[in-house]
Amino acid sequence: MANKKIRIRLKAYEHRTLDTAAGKIVENATRTGATVAGPVPLSTERSLYTIIRATHKYKDSREQFEMRTHKRLIDIINPTQKTVDALMKLDLPSGVNVEIKL
């Protein structure tokens, strides 16, 4: 291929589904003959929301909710056409966001 590297960035709320998706990508890429670097765990983005429990008063009574976004980075170096075809046909679990840069 003309491009020397494919960078895949994965995001998910659950780290187990993220790790299974990363494992499938690495397995398919190595099976087709490409060199793989990763999966590299990136920093986890944490969103914290504080909400007042009561509707009108009692501001001291609050509840906190948290949402974590886990991220992984995979580099596929010197991909072949078989590698690209295998990645296009790959079925990943739902809930995993995939960003691909060539």
From Swiss-Prot:
Record note on quaternary structure: Part of the 30S ribosomal subunit.
Protein name, entry field: Small ribosomal subunit protein uS10
A GO term from the CC aspect: ribosome
Gene3D superfamilies attached to this UniProt entry: Ribosomal protein S10 domain (3.30.70.600)
Similarity comment text for this entry: Belongs to the universal ribosomal protein uS10 family.
SMART domains per record: Ribosomal_S10
Biological process (GO), any one: translation
Highest taxon in the source lineage: Bacteria
Taxonomic lineage from the root: Bacteria, Bacillati, Bacillota, Bacilli, Lactobacillales
Gene Ontology MF, one: tRNA binding
NCBIfam families xrefs: PRK00596.1 (NF001861), rpsJ_bact (TIGR01049)
Xref: PANTHER family: 30S RIBOSOMAL PROTEIN S10 FAMILY MEMBER (PTHR11700)
UniProt keyword annotation of Aminoacyl-tRNA synthetase present: no
Keyword Transcription regulation: no
Name of the coding gene: rpsJ
Job description of the protein: Involved in the binding of tRNA to the ribosomes.
Keywords: Ribonucleoprotein, Ribosomal protein
Pfam families (UniProt xref): Ribosomal_S10 (PF00338)
Transmembrane region(s): none
Paired cysteines (S-S): none
